[in-house]
């Protein structure tokens, strides 16, 4: 399982070389560190975690697992940032495409995440992976809630 996130991110970067991202192995290691037992990475990609197209030093790795969406960024000197978005906290996903790059906006109950400087060719792939997973998981949550009410 070690380095599986890095391999998926590297494959993404090879498919979509226009995406601006640095230090992918370090960021991927943070996600590997926080995976729960039995948790598997379904899809992973890299982007800048900001809304400024000129800020290209805030790379983050985003991993969709069979339980949640993880966003990790390793600091240069020490420490890191990790966000975990479970399907019950997920509200909406918005994609915008510019001349060169595109953005992915993830709206949750508690925060609004902006991922930028993503190759335009990757936007449909990212939207399909995240949306289809979250829709299926939300159905499961609703079903569990209905069973609890009965």
Annotate each predicted stretch with a short phrase.
Residues 1-17, 21-24, 28-36, 54-57, ...:
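Acidic, Ser/Thr- and proline-rich intrinsically disordered linker/docking segments
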Residues 28, 45-49, 68, 75:
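Short glycine-rich, polar/acidic loop-and-turn segments at beta strand-coil junctions
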Residues 37-54:
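The phosphoinositide-binding surface of pleckstrin homology
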Residues 57-71:
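Polybasic phosphoinositide-binding surfaces of eukaryotic membrane-targeting domains
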């Amino acid at each position: 399982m070690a380095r599986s996130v890095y391999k998926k991110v590297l494959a993404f970067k090879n498919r979509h070389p226009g995406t601006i991202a640095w230090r992918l192995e370090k960021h991927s290691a943070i996600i590997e560190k926080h995976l729960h037992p039995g948790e598997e990475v379904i899809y992973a990609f890299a982007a800048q975690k900001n809304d400024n197209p000129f800020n290209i030093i805030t790379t983050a790795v985003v991993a969709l697992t069979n339980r949640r969406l993880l966003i990790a960024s390793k600091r240069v000197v020490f420490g890191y940032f990790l966000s975990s978005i479970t399907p019950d906290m997920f509200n909406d996903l918005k994609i915008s495409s510019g001349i060169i790059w595109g953005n992915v906006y993830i709206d949750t109950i508690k925060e609004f995440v902006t991922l930028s400087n993503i190759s335009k060719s990757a936007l449909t792939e990212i939207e399909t992976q995240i949306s289809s997973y979250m829709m299926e998981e939300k159905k499961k949550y609703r079903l569990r809630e209905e069973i609890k009410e009965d």
